[in-house]
């Protein structure tokens, strides 16, 4: 019966005199079992899913994986086990002796004494087929099952390791982690691409809405971090962000994760750029150190040549050009762009990728953008008629924009005038108040986490580096 637990048998047969006394068996993750250097027949129990089955005359070989590593643990069983019950994708619990492997392919193997099938897997109905390398596009149809493949397993382990590495970098450098709200009445980016939130059933009574003001899913934690930067000199947040962008491009999602930081007493973009570059390199080096096999799988089967490109990024200092210089480079390019580069017009993805190639595929900071292209909170440069702001974007190979940041406008009267011109004074009076009471020069940045993963792994489509992608016309599960 489907899902029924079945005990398949024992490898060790009882002797003619007596059966050996049952021994205590320690549960062990596959990753930990594979790391044992001097296996001497310890009795262990492993739980996981069958990745392969190979039957010979007198011996049965299984490979079991529990998600803790890319590599699976080889299980060796004798012919008393019924191989028909052990199918690809089934969940099992195996008890046996961990011994040194006779094969050069692995260091250890598990000699099975008991194999228990926990959950069957019907091979014909299972969309993931044995020994088949499914394209990532195909797997997107099955968000509830695709994590069982090697490719998605590796991507998600890298994602987990990168998350830990980011927290480690900020903790080691004295940043305070702030939980910024998911529900907000602010539009940080000013783009209007917001998801408005309302109760599923309308509130009865005189109040027009649950919060008495329109509420939205956050597009950024920046403004809340700026509040905190009035009490803590270094803060960061790392959480979900939402944009109602009607786009199905390879670079955009409706729900994604942002790493954002705010630093007080910062007076130059150079200080911000240093932190951005350090964060990128420290995180990447930790990922490469802690899960090299997973990164290698992505580089080998998803993005050939990505390993060399990544090493090139890590060993070189990031470059810096101004927005004005970037426009001049684009104007002189022999490439025909779909969007003509022009001063005062935002850079498009095609422009960003060209600039990175022009800079030798080294990440490049583009600084000092025209003020009309950027939100009200960015600090105005004192550069006369150009009227630019102290903004910075980091462009990286294969992706384009990865980081965006700026110095914040800390001067009360300048900010007051910008809010007035935008008709936002009433909505952001609290933000002006921050400049009244102990204001300091400060700045910050945000990094799209999924784009970061695309960059280091070479994954072309952003929908393949997040467990459950949400985008226009798609919210599966």
Curated annotation (Swiss-Prot):
Main subcellular localisation: mitochondrion
Listed EC numbers: 6.1.1.22
Catalytic activity: tRNA(Asn) + L-asparagine + ATP = L-asparaginyl-tRNA(Asn) + AMP + diphosphate + H(+)
GO BP term, example: asparaginyl-tRNA aminoacylation
GO molecular function, one term: ATP binding
Family of the protein in this entry: Belongs to the class-II aminoacyl-tRNA synthetase family.
PANTHER family: ASPARAGINE--TRNA LIGASE, MITOCHONDRIAL-RELATED (PTHR22594:SF34), ASPARTYL/LYSYL-TRNA SYNTHETASE (PTHR22594)
First and last residues of the transit peptide: 1-14
Tissues showing expression: Expressed in brain and inner ear, including the cochlear epithelium and organ of Corti.
Location in the cell: Mitochondrion matrix; Mitochondrion
Highest rank taxon of the organism: Eukaryota
Keyword Repeat (UniProt): no
One Pfam match: tRNA-synt_2
Annotated positions of the N6-acetyllysine modification: 353
HAMAP family given in the database record: Asn_tRNA_synth
Function: Mitochondrial aminoacyl-tRNA synthetase that catalyzes the specific attachment of the asparagine amino acid (aa) to the homologous transfer RNA (tRNA), further participating in protein synthesis. The reaction occurs in a two steps: asparagine is first activated by ATP to form Asn-AMP and then transferred to the acceptor end of tRNA(Asn).
UniProt enzyme class: ligase
Keyword annotations from UniProtKB, A to Z: Acetylation, Aminoacyl-tRNA synthetase, ATP-binding, Ligase, Mitochondrion, Nucleotide-binding, Protein biosynthesis, Transit peptide
Source species of the chain: Mus musculus (Mouse)
Subunit-structure text: Homodimer.
GO CC list: cytosol; mitochondrial matrix; mitochondrion; nucleoplasm
Name the record gives this protein: Asparaginyl-tRNA synthetase
SUPFAM superfamilies: Class II aaRS and biotin synthetases (SSF55681), Nucleic acid-binding proteins (SSF50249)
Keyword Nucleotide-binding: yes
């Amino acid at each position: 019966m489907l899902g029924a637990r079945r005990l398949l048998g024992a490898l060790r047969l009882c002797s003619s005199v007596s059966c050996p006394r049952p021994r205590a068996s320690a549960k062990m993750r596959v990753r930990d079992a594979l790391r044992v250097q001097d296996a001497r027949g310890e009795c262990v129990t492993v739980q996981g899913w069958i990745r392969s089955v190979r039957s010979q005359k007198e011996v049965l070989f299984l490979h079991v994986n529990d998600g803790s590593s890319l590599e699976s643990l080889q299980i060796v069983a004798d012919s008393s086990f019924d191989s028909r019950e052990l199918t690809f994708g089934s969940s099992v619990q195996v008890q046996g002796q961990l011994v040194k492997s006779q094969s050069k392919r692995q260091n250890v193997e598990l000699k099975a004494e008991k194999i228990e099938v926990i959950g069957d897997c019907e091979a014909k109905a299972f969309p993931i087929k044995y020994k088949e390398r499914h394209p990532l596009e195909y797997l997107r149809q099955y968000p509830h099952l695709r994590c069982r493949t090697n490719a998605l397993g590796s991507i998600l382990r890298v994602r987990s390791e990168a998350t830990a590495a980011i927290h480690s970098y900020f903790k080691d450098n004295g940043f305070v982690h702030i939980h910024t709200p998911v529900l907000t009445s602010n539009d940080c980016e000013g783009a209007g691409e917001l998801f408005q939130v309302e109760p599923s059933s309308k509130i009865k009574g005189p109040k027009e809405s649950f919060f008495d003001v329109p509420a939205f899913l956050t597009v950024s934690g920046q403004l809340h971090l700026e509040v905190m930067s009035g009490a803590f000199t270094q803060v960061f947040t790392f959480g979900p962000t939402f944009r109602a962008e009607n786009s199905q491009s390879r670079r955009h999602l409706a729900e994604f994760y942002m790493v954002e930081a705010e630093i007080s007493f910062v007076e130059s973009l150079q200080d911000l750029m240093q932190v951005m570059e350090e964060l990128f390199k420290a995180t990447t080096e930790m990922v490469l150190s802690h899960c090299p096999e997973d990164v290698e799988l992505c580089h080998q089967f998803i993005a050939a040549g990505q390993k060399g490109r990544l090493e090139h990024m890590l060993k070189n200092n990031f470059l810096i050009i101004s927005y004005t210089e970037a426009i001049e480079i684009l104007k002189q390019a022999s490439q025909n762009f779909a969007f003509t580069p022009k001063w005062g017009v935002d850079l498009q993805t095609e422009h960003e990728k060209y600039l990175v190639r022009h800079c030798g595929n080294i990440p490049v900071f583009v600084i000092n953008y025209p003020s009309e292209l950027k939100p009200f909170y960015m600090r105005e440069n004192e550069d006369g008629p150009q009227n630019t702001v102290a903004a910075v974007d980091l462009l990286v190979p294969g992706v384009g924009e990865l980081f965006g940041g700026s110095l914040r406008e800390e001067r009360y009267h300048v900010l007051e005038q910008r809010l007035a011109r935008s008709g936002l004074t009433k909505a952001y009076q609290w933000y002006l108040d921050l400049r009244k009471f102990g204001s300091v020069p400060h700045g910050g940045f945000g990094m799209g986490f999924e784009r970061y993963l695309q960059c280091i792994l070479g994954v072309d489509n952003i929908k393949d580096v997040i467990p459950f992608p949400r985008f226009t016309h798609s919210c599966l599960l």
